[in-house]
Amino acid sequence: AAGLLGFLAGMAADLDVVIRSSTDPLLFLEYHRQFTHSLIFIPLGGVICALVLHYLLGRRRGLSFGQSWLFCTLGYATHALLDACTTYGTMLLWPFSDQRFAWNTISIIDPLFTLPLLLAVVLAARMRKPVLARFGLAWAVVYMGLGLVQREAAEEMGYALAAQRGHQPIRLEAKPSFANILVWKTVYETEDRYYVDGVRATLRPRVFAGNTVEKLVLDRDMPWLDPQSQQARDVERFRWFSNGYIARDPVYSNRVMDIRYSLLPNEIDPLWSIELKPEAALRDHALYKTHRDGGPDRASVLWEMITGR
């Protein structure tokens, strides 16, 4: 019962995805991983989960409400910290700060992390052997540690690559590519450009040379945009969400893209962007676009990068 309550409560924080607006396409970007993922919200999140789960599960298993609250709170507490280990950004200190914490040690989706952990928990529950759950916890800690080592190695490779080009980065980040911690995407910023590359860290190190794009300058790139318009405000909201890593799409000139994410680590092709319209009214919002039609070809290329072929 304790494990089930903790598991369900641990998933509850992501219910913030239902916070959306039919008139403001960017609203969900502000609220996903916001107050429900804040450290200060954890006790209240545990209470809310316990109010539901105690009467559905806890009471039937002979638990007091206090016990249900404790197990729900412990489960709920794991969610935000695990999310902060990913690359998306989590507002741990809301409402005191709107900083999005992203420790970049693991991909948002990584079966090599999730499946062994889930298997250990399920077997521990079915076989009534808590030691298996401890093995799962140990695996999670070890894997996160490996991700940290890999991130540091990827950043070192990124700085070395920048030095070879004669660049002194203003900032540089390394993020794991999709579903693994072997191949990483490095993004570094110079005075006027961003540079994106893929690197295979530690195991048979290798650089997958990428591309570069100019930083967004609204006066130059979109001179028609009214600074007082809602679209201009939406650009700044998207800049905050993207930690400043935004550029005009070189193919679609009215799109502003988040260059941090792509299906292949050495590409700039974004997974999402916002689209502005010159003819839009003053109060019209920018449109949010997703671009995830990579197909099997890109998946096979990523697999070759991971396996070192």
Per-region residue spans from a language model:
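Short, surface-exposed binding/anchoring microloops in extracellular/periplasmic proteins
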Residues: 180
